[in-house]
């Protein structure tokens, strides 16, 4: 019997895949637990339309990430913080502070976990910050850290 998996099943496969399994395994295990449905033509059509919608949604997310990346790469952000002698900061500038500065100065709401710093910013100056907006799209922008 052919079944379409509704969830990942260990030792069988991933959600959305079609498999040939024995009738007993399907009726006694997969169907009662809601892990699979029978692969009828209607269910296969539903699966195909869901996959097409997912692809369209992923492509749209990628396009949005690319437009945001183009916008971010032209920006630079200023952060004012307390510093000691020789340009060393008291503490460091974190992703959270950079994300807040982005929102305050340019109105871009970006999750702090998407910002990648090679190392914490602990001095005054200009630094490049990379933002991973999508698995295939990254943007780089400058952060100017100045004494307050």
From Swiss-Prot:
One Gene Ontology biological process: translation
Entry-linked InterPro entries: Ribosomal_bL9, Ribosomal_bL9/RNase_H1_N, Ribosomal_bL9_bac/chp, Ribosomal_bL9_C, Ribosomal_bL9_C_sf, Ribosomal_bL9_N, Ribosomal_bL9_N_sf
The family this protein is said to belong to: Belongs to the bacterial ribosomal protein bL9 family.
S-S bridge residues: none
Full protein name: Large ribosomal subunit protein bL9
GN (gene name): rplI
UniProt KW Manganese keyword: no
Alphabetical keyword list: Ribonucleoprotein, Ribosomal protein, RNA-binding, rRNA-binding
A Pfam family per the record: Ribosomal_L9_C
SUPFAM superfamilies: L9 N-domain-like, Ribosomal protein L9 C-domain
Single Gene Ontology MF annotation: structural constituent of ribosome
Function: Binds to the 23S rRNA.
């Amino acid at each position: 019997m052919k079944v379409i998996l509704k969830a990942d099943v260990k030792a069988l496969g991933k959600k959305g895949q079609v498999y040939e399994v024995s009738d007993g395994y399907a009726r006694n295990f997969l169907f009662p637990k809601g892990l699979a449905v029978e692969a009828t033509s209607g269910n296969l059509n539903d699966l195909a339309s869901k996959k097409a919608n997912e692809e369209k949604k992923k492509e749209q997310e990628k396009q949005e990430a690319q437009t945001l990346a183009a916008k971010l790469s032209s920006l630079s952000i200023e952060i004012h913080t307390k510093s000691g002698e020789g340009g060393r900061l008291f503490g460091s500038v974190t992703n959270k502070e950079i994300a807040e500065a982005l929102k305050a100065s340019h109105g871009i709401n970006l999750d702090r976990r998407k910002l990648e710093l090679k190392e914490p910013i602990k001095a005054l100056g200009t630094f490049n910050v990379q933002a991973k907006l999508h698995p295939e799209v990254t943007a780089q922008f400058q952060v100017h850290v100045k004494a307050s």
